[in-house]
């Protein structure tokens, strides 16, 4: 057995012992009690050129989400619904083990889970976002940047996405002669439910 592998095993055993001791003493690794929540801080409107945005700090995890609304073609099989696309990026400064480059499998999974949570909650009435059914729909992009990773990444990212969407100002597009025209008018996402 190599010395690096032996060191890893020793560290894993020490960590297990530390966790056992913390459980017995009624504490978590970060010093919180078992029923104590991580502190939550939020700020909305942090990206001025986005249709909506939010910054969330949950414990030591920080996430920024920005919303951009455009028009585009509907997804196949969903011709009469608007499109939602959630993407995520973990900045290399978020944790010591993060490498620069394209998103890894875990980051892609994070974006998919958050995307699915928004869709299946039906917080967005995607069926009301078809401008020309089968041809042109609202396309809502939500880009998430993970600034710091300190646990509970799925919750922090979900909070940021929901806040960014809930506070978005959506452009109003008009249909003239089977074409979409940007009217430059904005309304808040609350109006989408009316």
Regions found by a protein language model. Give the residues of each.
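Conserved bacterial/organellar gene-expression machines centered on ribosome-associated P-loop NTPases
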Residues: 1-18, 71, 85, 89, ...
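A generic structural motif
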Residues: 92-98, 145-152
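Conserved small/polar residues in nucleotide/adenosyl-binding loops
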Residues: 187-192
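Conserved interaction-surface patches within small, structured recognition/assembly domains
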Residues: 124-130, 142-149
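Short, conserved phosphate-binding/catalytic loop or strand-edge motifs used
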Residues: 133-141
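Conserved mixed alpha/beta catalytic, RNA-binding, or beta-rich assembly cores of soluble enzyme
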Residues: 148, 153-171
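Glycine-rich, flexible beta-strand/loop modules in the N-terminal catalytic cores of phosphate-handling
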Residues: 44-133
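Short, Gly/Pro- and small/polar-rich lid/capping loops
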Residues: 3-48
């Amino acid at each position: 057995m190599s010395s690096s592998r032996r060191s890893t095993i020793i560290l894993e055993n020490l960590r297990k012992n530390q966790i056992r001791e913390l459980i017995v003493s009624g504490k978590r690794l970060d010093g919180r009690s078992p029923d104590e929540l991580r502190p939550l801080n939020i700020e909305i409107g942090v990206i001025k050129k986005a249709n909506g945005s939010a910054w969330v700090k949950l414990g030591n995890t920080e996430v920024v989400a920005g919303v951009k609304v455009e028009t585009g073609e509907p997804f196949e099989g969903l011709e009469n619904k608007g499109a939602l696309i959630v993407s995520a990026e973990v900045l290399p400064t978020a944790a010591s083990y993060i490498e620069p480059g394209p998103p890894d499998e875990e980051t892609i999974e994070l974006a998919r889970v958050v995307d699915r949570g928004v869709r299946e909650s039906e917080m967005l009435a995607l069926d009301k976002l078809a401008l020309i059914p089968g041809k042109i729909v609202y396309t809502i992009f939500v880009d998430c940047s993970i600034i710091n990773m300190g646990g509970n990444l799925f919750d922090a990212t979900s909070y940021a996405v929901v806040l960014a969407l809930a506070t978005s100002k959506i452009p109003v597009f008009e249909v003239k002669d089977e074409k979409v025209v940007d009217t430059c008018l904005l309304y808040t996402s609350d109006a989408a439910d009316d």
